[in-house]
Design a protein with these regions (language model features):
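Short, low-complexity intrinsically disordered segments enriched in A/P/G/S/L with frequent Arg
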Residues: 16, 21-23
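Membrane-interface helix-loop junctions and terminal tails of multi-pass membrane proteins
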Residues: 6-12, 24-258
């Protein structure tokens, strides 16, 4: 079996066109194959970057346009997620959230190297969106658009709320975006879960359920108050969601994404 190399192959001028014609297609097209392979790894990362960018951009912008209208804010987040999960599901799995990626890792559906690449793309998307919002609306709006704990809520209570809300989200992700038995409902179901979680948890913690949703604005506005809550809670809840679905719901193991 001939295996094409990604390194260019030198052809002497005396070889002429006949020499080129005699080369196997696998060698002639090796550069195209390598380029295609590189793009195949880049496309999911670009999809995650764009989807996460959209979520943070709309999320912060909703605070500028809707203010304290929790229904409008919840719908803005939920509809954005529904649209971009649907748009990226066939490209990257429509994760758009480091906690969801961690849940899929715990559920056995993604490898550690892939998870790290996805985390970088998601966090960069969040930072880029927050920086643009900073230039458009100013630091005050970015801070107002960053999920925060209610005055009467402790950090431990915030972690518990974020963990439970993220558990719901990751469980739904496994049941729709991952499990082929429910994949047709993924965008709607995940968007609806985000909307419902924000309607309940928005007044308590801001219902981030997504470290990138907090990390991007924190970097842009240099606002780190109770920041760890929005990593610990979602990652614990995401891990539990992945483990529970894998152990108790799945009928048979599913393919791991490289």
């Amino acid at each position: 079996m001939l295996v094409a190399s990604c390194s260019p192959r030198r052809i002497r001028p005396s070889d002429g066109g006949a020499r080129r014609a005699a080369l196997p297609n696998s060698v002639v097209n090796s550069k195209s194959i390598c380029l295609h392979g590189g793009m195949a790894k880049f496309r999911p990362l670009l999809a995650e970057f764009i989807g996460t960018f959209a979520l943070i951009f709309v999320g912060i912008g909703a605070m500028k346009t809707a203010g304290d209208n929790i229904v409008a804010v919840a719908l803005a987040h939920g509809l954005t997620i529904a649209a971009f999960v649907s748009a990226t599901l066939h490209i990257s799995g429509g994760q758009l959230n480091p906690a969801v990626t961690f849940g899929l890792l715990c559920g056995g559906h993604i490898t550690w190297p892939s998870a790290f690449r996805y985390w970088i793309a998601q966090l960069l998307g969040g930072i880029a969106a927050a920086l643009i919002c900073l230039s458009l609306f100013g630091r005050g709006v970015v801070i107002a658009g960053t999920p925060q704990l209610a005055i009467n809520l402790t950090a431990a209570q915030g972690i518990l709320v974020e963990g439970i809300l993220t558990f719901f989200l990751v469980f739904v992700v496994h049941g729709t975006a991952v499990d082929p038995r429910g994949r047709g409902l993924a965008g709607f179901a995940i968007g609806a879960t985000i909307t419902l979680d924000i309607l309940f948890g928005g007044p308590l913690t801001g219902a981030a359920m997504n470290p990138a949703r907090v990390f991007g604005p924190a970097v842009a506005a240099n606002f780190w108050h109770d920041h760890y809550v929005y990593w610990v809670g979602p990652f614990v809840g995401g891990a539990l969601g992945g483990f529970v679905y894998r152990i108790f719901i799945e009928r048979k193991p599913m393919t791991v994404t490289e």
